[in-house]
Regions:
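Short, polar/acidic, helix-capping and beta-turn segments at strand->helix junctions
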Residues: 2-126
């Protein structure tokens, strides 16, 4: 049976709860949801959806890189928006990173941690 391997990098925000930044299992990396915390400051700095989405993508990129993967190997993403009115602006940022158009779900939720506007998680191959 394949082992679970935890992924951790200081180039993305530390988990704010009892979970790992990502887990590798059987040749696949499963990231936890990333929110737009700047890992250098520990703060959410951007106030608009585009800025927050960019920070989320930077964080995800670092987690994927540490795991030995990247955006081009994404199989599935799950995206959470605080307001579906931000859908188009979010997609503009998302499309710059996920150029292979992986499977995706995108939903609006009532509240996200730290009252951010966006959170994204990824399943990717190694």
């Amino acid at each position: 049976m394949a082992e679970l391997k935890k992924v951790a990098t200081d180039k993305a925000p530390a988990a704010i709860g009892p979970y790992s930044q990502a887990i590798i299992y059987n040749g696949t990396v499963f990231t936890s949801g990333q929110i737009p915390i700047n890992p250098a400051s520990g703060n959410v700095e951007a106030t608009d959806i585009a800025g927050q989405a960019e920070q989320v993508m930077k964080n995800l990129g670092e987690v994927l890189k540490t795991a030995g993967s990247d955006f081009t190997k994404a199989v599935k993403t799950t995206c959470f928006l605080a307001d579906m009115a931000d859908f188009a602006a979010f997609n503009a940022v998302y499309a710059k990173y996920f150029t292979t158009n992986p499977a995706r779900s995108c939903v609006a939720v009532k509240t996200l941690p730290k009252n951010v506007l966006v959170e994204v998680e990824v399943i990717a191959s190694l």
